[in-house]
UniProtKB/Swiss-Prot annotation:
Protein name: Large ribosomal subunit protein uL4
SUPFAM superfamilies named in the record: Ribosomal protein L4
Organism: Lactococcus lactis subsp. lactis (strain IL1403) (Streptococcus lactis)
Family from the record: Belongs to the universal ribosomal protein uL4 family.
GO biological process, one term: translation
The encoding gene: rplD
Cross-referenced InterPro entries: Ribosomal_uL4, Ribosomal_uL4-like, Ribosomal_uL4_dom_sf
Amino acid sequence: MAKVSLFKQDGSQAGEVTLNDSVFGIEPNESVVFDVVISQRASLRQGTHAHKNRSAVSGGGKKPWRQKGTGRARQGSTRSPQWRGGGTVFGPNPRSYAYKLPQKVRQLALKSVYSTKVADGKLIAVDTLDFTAPKTAEFAKVISALSIERKVLVVLPNEGNEFAELSARNLANVKVTTANSASVLDIVSADKLLVVQSALTQIEEVLA
């Protein structure tokens, strides 16, 4: 069974936490992680690109010259695609790039990235993140006490963490999520994970 050190908010060690190997100790599947990251990045795309076809371009209502007798090619509109200033053919339309992978694939990817963080020593467990009011300075002290210098993803329990979330949202390189909302993309993008002990339990309940 994998074990990680358990810390208090002040940075002192409070013991160890034993992790479920079926969640935090598997052999990472990099191919599945890649597929899920691509899927989640695709879901973030706005998809608001658009073009104007010949019916949407302004003007062009009048036939430019009569059908016969001019010696020129017949034309019905100055906004046909072959004209300068004409409509675009087969251009982009607004659409969603999102697509959904099977649940088991997404869960395997989560297990893989969690296991990688544990194996690399980049998962930090903390017994609690308890704040009596939303104070950015107080959360900054926690980050400093735990010697976290680079980008960190803070994983909170699913409920009852409003002050902790508000305290962290104005800090650079700190992103906050919950046990049920943590995504593969967020975890991969972070250098370290700071996970509350109760959130670890909730993660294991879902993924084990």
